[in-house]
Amino acid sequence: EENNISWSRQLEEAGCLVVYGIDGLKVHSKLCLITVKSDDGIQYITQIGTGNYNEKTARLYTDLSLMTANYEIGDEARKTFQEILIGNTIDRTQHLLVAPNSLQQPVIDMIEDEIEYAKKGEQSYIGIKVNSLTDKKIMDKLVEASKAGVHIDMVVRGICCLIPGVEGETENIHIRSIVGRYLEHSRIYIFGTKERDKIYISSADFMTRNTLRRVEVAAPVYDERLKERIRNMFSIMLKDNVLARTALPDGRYEIIDDGKKKLNSQEYFIEEAYKQKIQKLKYGELRKNMVLLQYQFSGGFLWKQ
């Protein structure tokens, strides 16, 4: 992109080493690694996102971003960058899922895990939010999971080659599309029930161009508070009866008329963001007043610089 070329030139002129990717593979991951060296050793601060570093689309797209000081995740991010630097792609990872070599198969393996739970008569669950779904291997595994009794909820905004609700095949798969003021762009993978779930945010849709022909990164979410937040977000999307359309076995999409109170998921998240902002402002004002009182009680003065 023209804008990328401009920034790359400016970075090079400033003395930065700019690597333009790998021949034959598009680098579509959204990955940033900050390495801090100190007397205590090396610390990594890693940011993994679902959306581009683009100030224009950031105002129009819905995305998720994770920042973590987890050393092992940071080290895998370092290895990912290291491989790209020499024109290779990373093969084995313990935490990150990195396409084209180690994303599709781990996803299939986690679907298989849910199949095994279902076969044992235990609760099983898969929740997926992507822009598009065309990867045949993943779709075949999801059908197998449905047949085994795994409950599968999917939010697929765009192209979807999987037909839900077919008796004996995909009757346990529920698919909806959400199209609203903002472009739904985040990718979320949830495998397992709340007590044992694995949750990832990702740059990759479930398309073979993403899983096999691009550099993509999916990051695990380990913090329980963040996992709960993502679960709640996904739950709200599944309750949306304003922007959402549900996919039918005949290929049509239908307006949701469930008789429940109208819920626009995008408006809900905006309202929640405003509430959090107001709470932070109130907290900041409270702290300022507490500092002022402390100075007054101590007989001091608080000067504004």
Predicted regions mapped to residue ranges:
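Short, compositionally biased "basic patch" segments
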Residues: N70-D91, Q105-P106
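Gly-rich Lys/Arg/Thr-decorated short loops/hinges at beta-loop-alpha junctions or inter-strand turns
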Residues: G87-L96, G121-Q123
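PLD/PLD-like phosphodiesterase catalytic module centered on the HKD motif
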Residues: E1-T57, M67-G74, P100-W303
